[in-house]
Amino acid sequence: LRYLQKHYWKTKYSFNFPRMRPSENGGFQPNVVMSDRELAQVTFATRIFDHDVDISYSTRESASFRDNMARLGVTTMSAESKTEPGGYYSYPQTLEQFHVSDERTAKEVTLALKNLGIEPVWKDWDQSFDAVNCQEHAATTTV
């Protein structure tokens, strides 16, 4: 990371530590499963290493774990994620790549963050996320 920051200093860097989960179709089973405690330790170590880097948590993590980590170093979270190919355009749900643990709607995630004293900021640089439709799509919330 330090090399990249030195040579590409105008770039913003981020980390995501998605835990490998068994696939819904049973094809993939992880050899090692990282505990909540271990993921928290990796998150804290990363935050100590670099206080400016973004740290993202996906909907693979449980709602309670994401809520608890929101004030402890995580900067972005997804909401209403679809994990199957074409999942935002094709229904019904087929070929899910992995299980989504946090199944809350974007509105529910927003409310949970507000209840923690965090002001959610929606991704606003893509035309598909306008103020009218932001709650109908998966979104990224900056915390």
State each model region's role:
Residues 3:
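Conserved binding/catalytic microenvironments
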